[in-house]
């Protein structure tokens, strides 16, 4: 008799029970791992799968997390074979090529499209009913690519979009007002990154519109220069990259925030990237961030934001830029 047999007597043969809220993270780079640890520490799933083409790095990361199993309630698995991801509820895609110095955005996009041509069909094969969350950059274009390659309905393909931009925005407004970010309500919509659109007309604390108190807010003529806050949001990522080489923690927490709303069916409103054709005068098949309701079925509703003419124009301009890139892609 083995030690195990002496210690434990078997009462019944266990039937394998599938995980009801399994999450997969594709890509174990800085963003993938920050997303994984954030999901684990929020206790969102009973199984977390990780997959990557870099076998040793993947093995090391999985092992490192498994060594902390005592402090977690989640089963952690990892493999370069996508069968490990089977029956996931949410699949978070963080994998992709990094932009090389002097490389055009379009070239980077096409390289990532080629990577997605391998990743997305594999996800669909093993988790045909999952909700796909794209985090890789440029996120709006790659969410469109994932939607096209997966054949999923639009409610099940979401881009992390401006959820992080809005969090940065609220943090900086909070710093200026000496308030917690959760008490500063503010939205950034549109394209994630350089051409994102801050909705100054909607910025409020306890329902008090800040633009009502300072009608010049967000414009060039504002003596308090609130506009600089949006510039800081846009420059924030570049600043972090300059200082530490990459961004990870905030985007990881942002991803876990979105996963939580889906897994727990919270019907929370988040600025995430979705198909905006027909909204705000956008004519093309593009994905941009608008306030959207997230729950168990993915993205169930979109909130109609009251945007000023200038803000709508910025959105349409982003849409045209994205479409210009998308129509050149070979899918």
Curated annotation (Swiss-Prot):
Keyword check for Nucleus: no
Top-level division of the source organism's lineage: Eukaryota
Main location: cytoplasm
Catalytic residue list: 192
Lineage: Eukaryota, Metazoa, Chordata, Craniata, Vertebrata
Residues engaged in binding substrate: 105, 137, 168, 247
Source organism of this protein record: Dissostichus eleginoides (Patagonian toothfish)
Keyword Cytoplasm listed: yes
EC number(s) recorded for this UniProt protein: 1.1.1.27
Alphabetical list of PROSITE patterns matching this protein: L_LDH
Reaction equation(s) it catalyzes: (S)-lactate + NAD(+) = pyruvate + NADH + H(+)
GO biological process: lactate metabolic process
Known pathway: Fermentation; pyruvate fermentation to lactate; (S)-lactate from pyruvate: step 1/1
Residues involved in NAD(+) binding: 29-57, 98, 137
Keyword annotations: Cytoplasm, NAD, Oxidoreductase
Protein name: L-lactate dehydrogenase A chain
Function: Interconverts simultaneously and stereospecifically pyruvate and lactate with concomitant interconversion of NADH and NAD(+).
GO molecular function (one): L-lactate dehydrogenase activity
Pfam families associated with the record: Ldh_1_C (PF02866), Ldh_1_N (PF00056)
Complexes and interactors: Homotetramer.
InterPro entries: L-lactate/malate_DH, L-lactate_DH, L-lactate_DH_AS, Lactate/malate_DH_C, Lactate/malate_DH_N, Lactate_DH/Glyco_Ohase_4_C, NAD(P)-bd_dom_sf
